[in-house]
């Protein structure tokens, strides 16, 4: 296959440090030359491991990943990138560069999600604070794993799209299918199942945040 002249793509994601979020541009460049794959931009070990997860997920989703030189830059480079939430935006960026994803009006969508080797999306930690921070920074649309959809959808004024796998994301971005944006009332998220009771003791650290929540709750009684 001939390499397209447009082999650079940018997909939005977010890095979370504590409760503070930083918008990340996942830049993917694909060129001819010695086949290789590098991830730069201060990634931790789990982000570096995304190479094999993403490569296999793309292949098992039915897309051909040609032998190319692939460089993934997570910008800005001075912010440490942690966790597996960049799997989805990296995969989408590669498929944009290969022109598997052809629609151009998706640049304003933020994406987070961990990929399984079969292309399915696994739930992630920190979806709610990521979505809160994304809204503060002007993001209106987010694609994330289906399992995180409900918690994220309590945020008013945002379109939250939950996807089950990489194929579903590709079809949605190409306009082949529709994914309904979920909206959930805050009260619905407070209904706890009988099988599990949540407790602040389960939260590691964040003492000042827990104290602030306790004070806020006391003031509403």
Residue ranges, per PLM feature:
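Peripheral, non-AAA+ core regions of ATP-driven protein-machinery
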Residues: 3-221
């Amino acid at each position: 296959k001939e390499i397209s002249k447009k082999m650079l793509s940018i997909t939005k994601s977010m890095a979370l440090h504590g409760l503070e979020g930083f918008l990340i541009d996942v830049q993917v460049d694909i060129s001819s030359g010695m086949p290789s794959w590098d991830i730069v931009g201060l990634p931790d070990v789990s982000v570096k491991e995304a190479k094999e997860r993403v490569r296999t997920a793309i292949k098992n989703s039915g897309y051909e990943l040609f032998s190319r030189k692939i460089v993934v830059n997570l910008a800005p480079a001075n912010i440490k990138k942690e966790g597996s939430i960049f799997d989805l935006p990296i995969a989408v960026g590669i498929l944009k560069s290969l022109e598997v994803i052809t629609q151009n009006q998706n640049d304003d969508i933020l994406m987070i999600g961990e990929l399984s080797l079969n292309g399915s999306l696994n739930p992630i930690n920190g979806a709610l604070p990521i979505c809160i921070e994304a809204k503060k920074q002007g993001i209106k649309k987010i694609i994330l794993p289906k399992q995180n959809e409900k918690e994220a959808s309590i945020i008013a004024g945002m379109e939250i799209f939950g996807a089950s796998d990489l194929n579903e994301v590709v079809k949605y971005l190409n306009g082949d299918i529709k994914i309904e944006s979920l909206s959930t009332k805050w009260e619905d998220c407070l209904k706890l199942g009988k099988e599990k009771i949540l407790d602040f003791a389960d939260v590691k650290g964040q003492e000042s945040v827990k104290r602030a929540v306790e004070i806020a709750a006391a003031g509403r009684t």
